C-alpha cells in the first residue's frame, strides 16, 4: 500500500513540476517566437501551400469559428465513409466487418468532438486502416482544434483593441507539429520499449500456461495510445482500454499514460499566463484547478484502498483494497488516481471499471465531469473555466460597485448572456437526457438497458449523459448502450456539449477584444487575487455543482447510503 501511495504522489509531483516549462513553451509556439522545434517550419509551409492557406491572414472571431467548424464537418464525412466501408479497405487481416450506419455516425461524432465514447470494441469493431486513418487522425485533429481555439482566445485577450484573433489554420498546424506529434513520439517510444505492440500482423493464437489456446489481438497500438492520452481523447485501441496488458503493460506505463492525460491541460493554464503576460493570474487559476483535482484524489484514493464494506462483513480480507473491476498489476490506489485524472480532463480512458468503483468514487468522477472546468480537455478545459471567470467578474463588479472588466476589456450584458448560456447548456443536456432515458426505461423495462436497477441504474444513465456532454468518453459499462436510442441521444449531447461552448467562448473573446482598451486604475477589479479566485470557485460550485445535487442524491449518494 505504501508503494501505491508513493506512486500517486510521484505522479502528482511530476505533473505539477513539468507543466510549467511546457506551458511556457506552448505560449512561445502560439506567439510565433523561436523554439527548438523551428526545424518543423518547412513542413508547415508545405502544408500551407498544399492546402492553399495564407499563414499571414488574421481572422476575426466569426471567420475563425467558420474555419474550425468546416474542418470538423469535412473530417466527419471522411470518417463516415471509411467506417461504413472498412471491410473492403486494406490493413484488415482479421476480416472485421463494416460498422452499421448508426454506429458509424455515433463513432465519428464521438471522436470528432474529443469524447471517444465507444459503443464498439476496438479488436472487432475497427480495422487497422480505420484505427489509423479515422481514429488516430481524429484524435490529432480534435485535440489541435481545441488548442487552436484557446490560442485564438489568448490572442484576443492579450490585444488591446483588435478584431483579429489569429489564424485558425496556423494554430491547428502548429498544435500538431510542435506540441502533439513530438510528445506522442516520445511517449510511443517509451511504450514500445515496455512491451506495447507496434505491428500490422493479425491476431495470434497462443497456448497459455494452463494449456488452453487463446487468441491475442495486436496491431499498431503504440502509435495510437500516446495521442489517445496526450490529446485528452481516451478512445482505447482495445475494448477494455488501458486495462489491457498490451495497451498498458506495467506500473511504469501506467504512470506514463496517466501523466500524459493531464500534462497538456495543466500546461495550457500556464500558457495563458505566459501569453498574456499575467503569470500571477495564471497561477491563481492553476491553483483553483489543482485544489479541486487534489481534493478529488483525497476522496477517491482512500475509498478504493479501504475496500468494500459488504465484503468486510463477510469476513474476507481486503489488504489490496476494493479490487472488483481492477487489474492486480495496477492496484486500487493507481486505479483511483487514474479515475480522477481521466474525469478531471475530457480524456475518459480507463485502467479499471468505473462501474465497479465505490459509490463516492463514482460520484467524484461524475462531479468532475459535471463541473467540467478543472483542467478539462486540451484547450477547451481552460475555455470552460473562462466562461465562469466572465460570470465571476460580472457578479464581483456588481457587488463592489465597480465596472466589470477583464484584462482591460469591459464585460457587459452581451458577454454575460453568452457566458450564462454556455454554463447552463451543460446541466441542461445531462439532466434532460437522463430524465428522458429514465422515463423510457421505467415505462419499457423489457428493453433491458439496465443490468443494475434502482440507484445504481440511475447512476449509469446519469454517467452516460455526463460523459457525453463533457466530451469525456468513460462510462459505467453496466449500461447496454449500443442501441439506436443511445447512439442518437448521446450523439446530440456530444455535438451540443462540444461546439456550443467553443462558439460561445470564442465569441466572448472576440467581442471583448473589439472593445476600447481600458487601462488599469485604482477602480479596476483585481482578478489575480486570492479573494477573486475564491469568488470564482464559489460561482463554479454554486452554478455547476449544485445544479446536479438532486440527481446525485438519487444516484450515487443514495447508492452509498444503501451500501
Regions found by a protein language model. Name each.
Residues 1-563:
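Membrane-proximal intracellular helices of multi-pass ion channels
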Amino acid at each position: 500500500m505504501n508503494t501505491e501511495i508513493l506512486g500517486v504522489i510521484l505522479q502528482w509531483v511530476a505533473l505539477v513540476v513539468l507543466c510549467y516549462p511546457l506551458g511556457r513553451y506552448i505560449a512561445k509556439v502560439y506567439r510565433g517566437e523561436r523554439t527548438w522545434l523551428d526545424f518543423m517550419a518547412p513542413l508547415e509551409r508545405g502544408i500551407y501551400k498544399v492546402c492553399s492557406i495564407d499563414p499571414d491572414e488574421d481572422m476575426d472571431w466569426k471567420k475563425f469559428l467558420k474555419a474550425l467548424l468546416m474542418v470538423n464537418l469535412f473530417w466527419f464525412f471522411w470518417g463516415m465513409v471509411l467506417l461504413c466501408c472498412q471491410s473492403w479497405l486494406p490493413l484488415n487481416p482479421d476480416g472485421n466487418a463494416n460498422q452499421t450506419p448508426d454506429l458509424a455516425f455515433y463513432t465519428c461524432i464521438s471522436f470528432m468532438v474529443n469524447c471517444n465514447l465507444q459503443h464498439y470494441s476496438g479488436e472487432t469493431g475497427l480495422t487497422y486502416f480505420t484505427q489509423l486513418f479515422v481514429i488516430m487522425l481524429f484524435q490529432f485533429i480534435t485535440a489541435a482544434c481545441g488548442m487552436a481555439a484557446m490560442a485564438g482566445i489568448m490572442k484576443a485577450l492579450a490585444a488591446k483593441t483588435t478584431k483579429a484573433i489569429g489564424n485558425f489554420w496556423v494554430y491547428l498546424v502548429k498544435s500538431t507539429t510542435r506540441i502533439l506529434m513530438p510528445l506522442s513520439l516520445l511517449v510511443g517510444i517509451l511504450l514500445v520499449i515496455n512491451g506495447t505492440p507496434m505491428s500490422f500482423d493479425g491476431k495470434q493464437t497462443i497456448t497459455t500456461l494452463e494449456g488452453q489456446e487463446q487468441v491475442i489481438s495486436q496491431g499498431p497500438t503504440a502509435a495510437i495510445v500516446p495521442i489517445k492520452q496526450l490529446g485528452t481523447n481516451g478512445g482505447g485501441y482495445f475494448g477494455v482500454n488501458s486495462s489491457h496488458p498490451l495497451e498498458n503493460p506495467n506500473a511504469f506505463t501506467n504512470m506514463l499514460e496517466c501523466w500524459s492525460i493531464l500534462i497538456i491541460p495543466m500546461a495550457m493554464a500556464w500558457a495563458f499566463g505566459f501569453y498574456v503576460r499575467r503569470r500571477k493570474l495564471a497561477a491563481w487559476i492553476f491553483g483553483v484547478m489543482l485544489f479541486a483535482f487534489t481534493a478529488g484524489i483525497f476522496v477517491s484514493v482512500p475509498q478504493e484502498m479501504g475496500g468494500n464494506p459488504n465484503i468486510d462483513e463477510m469476513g474476507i480480507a481486503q489488504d489490496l483494497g476494493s479490487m472488483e473491476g481492477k487489474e492486480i498489476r495496477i492496484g486500487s490506489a493507481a486505479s483511483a488516481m487514474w479515475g480522477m485524472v481521466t474525469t478531471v480532463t475530457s480524456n475518459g480512458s480507463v485502467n479499471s471499471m468505473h462501474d465497479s468503483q465505490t459509490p463516492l468514487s463514482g460520484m467524484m468522477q461524475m462531479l468532475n465531469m459535471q463541473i467540467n472546468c478543472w483542467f478539462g480537455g486540451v484547450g477547451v478545459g481552460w475555455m470552460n473555466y473562462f466562461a465562469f471567470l466572465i460570470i465571476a467578474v460580472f457578479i464581483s463588479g456588481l457587488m463592489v460597485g465597480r465596472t466589470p472588466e477583464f484584462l482591460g476589456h469591459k464585460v457587459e450584458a452581451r458577454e454575460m448572456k453568452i457566458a450564462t448560456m454556455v454554463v447552463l447548456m451543460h446541466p441542461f443536456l445531462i439532466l434532460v437526457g437522463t430524465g428522458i432515458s429514465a422515463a423510457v426505461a421505467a415505462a419499457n423495462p423489457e428493453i433491458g438497458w439496465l443490468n443494475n436497477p434502482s440507484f445504481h441504474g440511475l447512476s449509469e444513465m446519469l454517467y452516460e449523459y455526463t460523459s457525453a456532454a463533457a466530451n469525456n468518453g468513460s462510462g459505467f459499462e453496466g449500461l447496454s448502450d449500443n442501441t439506436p436510442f443511445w447512439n442518437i441521444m448521446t450523439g446530440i449531447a456530444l455535438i451540443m456539449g462540444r461546439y456550443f461552448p467553443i462558439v460561445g467562448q470564442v465569441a466572448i473573446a472576440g467581442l471583448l477584444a473589439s472593445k476600447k482598451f481600458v487601462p488599469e486604475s485604482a477602480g479596476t477589479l483585481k482578478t489575480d487575487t486570492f479573494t477573486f479566485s475564491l469568488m470564482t470557485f464559489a460561482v463554479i460550485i454554486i452554478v455547476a455543482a449544485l445544479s446536479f445535487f438532486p440527481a446525485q442524491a438519487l444516484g450515487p449518494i443514495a447508492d452509498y447510503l444503501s451500501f
